[in-house]
């Protein structure tokens, strides 16, 4: 678990709203990571949603999110909602083997700090995700800090672009006081649908004006980087080089 209850809504509302407002009546949603139930909480605000699949490798995390009183209060008991199915599996394996189709895929995985995590930021991973998307489906992934790890952020953008050449890639960011400026990458085949659907009730941070600003008016800048692959997991080296100057140990 890695969030502050004081400002986690900035992250989860942005990650979810950027995709959910860019697909007409999204019904089927896949969450990769998100075992704390906070992203599922946000997705359940959208009345068109019929099912959410949360794929998190750690059963202890998802059980804690279901049973801990404080976490349940924060995630609104989202993982116990009948529309939510929890799958304790590796995200890479799941999208590789799954035959399901989703309107929205949201990726809420930890940063690529080691080789075990590199596959979750590879062209192969993003290519498998594209195969799971409906024709007008949208994918959004968290993409590390645009301030602390700008080259890693750019590498994620370049990797998604290489894996999904027929889709438009949109990098953007929002400020989260606990973590700083945080980056996201959206991919879509229908950019004309961006932020075309209404936001749900109950949001504490995100609104249409803010969403328009971060996604259209001032999208995050990236530079061309070599894509990260299973054979050449460049993202790990780039991420750790970015972070080295900020570490005190």
Question: Which residues make up each language-model segment?
Answer:
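The AdoMet/dcAdoMet-binding core of the Class I SAM-like
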Residues: 9-141, 147-156, 161, 178
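Acidic/histidine-rich, surface-exposed loop or edge segments in extracytoplasmic proteins
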Residues: 1, 141-142
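Soluble small-group transferase modules, centered on the S-adenosyl donor enzyme superfamily
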Residues: 1-7, 11, 167-249
């Amino acid at each position: 678990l890695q969030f502050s209850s004081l400002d986690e809504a900035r992250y989860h509302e942005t990650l979810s709203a950027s995709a959910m407002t860019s697909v007409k009546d999204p019904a089927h949603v896949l969450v990769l990571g998100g075992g704390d139930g906070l992203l599922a909480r946000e997705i359940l605000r959208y009345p068109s949603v019929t099912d959410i699949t949360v794929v998190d490798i750690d059963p202890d995390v998802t059980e804690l999110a279901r049973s801990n009183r404080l976490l349940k209060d924060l995630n609104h008991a989202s993982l116990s909602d009948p529309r939510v199915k929890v799958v304790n599996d590796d995200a890479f394996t799941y999208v590789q083997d799954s035959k399901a189709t989703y309107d929205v895929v949201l990726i809420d995985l930890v940063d690529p700090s080691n080789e075990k995590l590199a596959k979750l930021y590879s062209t192969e991973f993003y290519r498998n995700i594209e195969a799971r998307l409906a024709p007008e489906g949208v994918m959004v992934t968290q993409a590390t800090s645009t301030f602390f790890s700008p080259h890693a952020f750019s590498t994620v953008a370049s990797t998604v672009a290489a894996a999904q050449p027929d889709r438009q890639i949109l990098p953007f960011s929002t400020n989260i006081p606990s973590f700083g400026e945080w980056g996201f990458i959206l991919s879509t085949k229908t950019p004309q649908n961006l932020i075309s659907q209404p936001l749900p009730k109950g949001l504490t941070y995100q609104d249409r004006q803010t969403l328009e600003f971060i996604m259209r008016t001032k999208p995050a800048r990236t530079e061309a980087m070599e894509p990260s692959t299973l054979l050449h997991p460049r993202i790990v080296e780039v991420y750790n080089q970015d972070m080295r100057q900020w570490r005190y140990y």
